[in-house]
C-alpha cells in the first residue's frame, strides 16, 4: 500500500496542475434586444442578407489579436462558440431588423422582388494598442442598382481581456449595422 501512495499522489497532483492550463473560453456575439416583429405585407420591403464572408485568418475557432503592425495571433484557449461568419450574419440580420421598420430582413431568400446585401469583413480583431478593428465593405443590390460601401471602425477598449474585446467588437459591428441601415433608409 505504501508503494502506491506516491504514485497516486503524483497522479492527483499532475491532474490538478494540468486542468487549469488547458481551460478554454467560448465567446458568442450578443444579439440586440428584439424589436418590432416584421411581417410581410403588401408594400413591405424585403432584404436578404445573403452572405457575410471573412478571410481565412478569421475563419478558425480562435479569437484574433493583432500584436504588431504586421503580426496576428490566433488564440488557442479563447474561441468562438460558433463560426464567426455565422455569428456576424445572425447579429447583422437582428440589428437590421430592429433598425429598418417596414422591412422584412432575413438570412434566407424572400422572393424575386428583394434587395440583397453581401458583406465582406476583412478585419474583426483586437489590437495591441487596446483598440478593436472592424473593417471591410458591403455590396447592396437594390432594384438592380449596385451600391458598394467600404467601412473601417476603430473603437478603444475601456477594459483589458478577451471578454471586453468581444463586447467592443460586437459594439463596433452593431455600429456598422446602424450605418448600413441609414444607407438603406435613404434609398428611394
Question: Predicted segment positions?
Answer:
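Soluble periplasmic/extracytoplasmic beta-strand elements of cell-envelope proteins
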Residues: 46-51, 64, 116-121, 133-137, ...
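N-terminal segment of the mature soluble domain
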Residues: 44-113
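C-terminal motif of bacterial Sec signal peptides marking the signal peptidase cleavage site
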Residues: 12-15
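C-terminal/domain-edge helix-coil "capping" segments
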Residues: 17, 21-25, 34-36, 159-188
Amino acid at each position: 500500500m505504501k508503494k502506491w501512495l506516491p504514485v497516486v499522489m503524483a497522479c492527483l497532483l499532475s491532474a490538478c496542475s494540468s486542468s487549469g492550463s488547458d481551460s478554454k473560453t467560448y465567446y458568442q456575439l450578443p444579439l440586440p434586444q428584439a424589436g418590432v416583429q416584421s411581417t410581410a405585407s403588401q408594400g413591405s420591403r424585403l432584404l436578404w442578407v445573403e452572405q457575410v464572408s471573412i478571410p481565412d485568418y478569421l475563419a478558425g475557432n480562435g479569437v484574433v489579436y493583432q500584436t504588431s503592425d504586421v503580426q496576428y495571433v490566433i488564440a488557442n484557449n479563447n474561441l468562438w462558440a460558433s463560426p464567426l461568419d455565422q455569428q456576424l450574419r445572425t447579429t447583422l440580420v437582428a440589428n437590421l431588423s430592429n433598425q429598418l421598420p417596414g422591412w422584412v430582413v432575413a438570412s434566407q431568400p424572400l422572393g424575386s422582388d428583394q434587395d440583397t446585401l453581401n458583406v465582406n469583413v476583412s478585419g474583426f480583431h483586437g489590437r495591441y494598442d487596446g483598440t478593436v478593428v472592424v473593417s471591410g465593405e458591403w455590396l447592396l443590390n437594390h432594384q438592380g442598382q449596385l451600391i458598394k460601401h467600404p467601412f473601417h471602425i476603430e473603437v478603444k477598449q475601456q477594459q483589458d481581456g478577451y471578454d471586453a474585446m468581444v463586447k467592443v467588437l460586437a459594439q463596433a459591428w452593431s455600429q456598422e449595422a446602424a450605418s448600413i441601415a441609414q444607407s438603406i433608409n435613404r434609398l428611394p
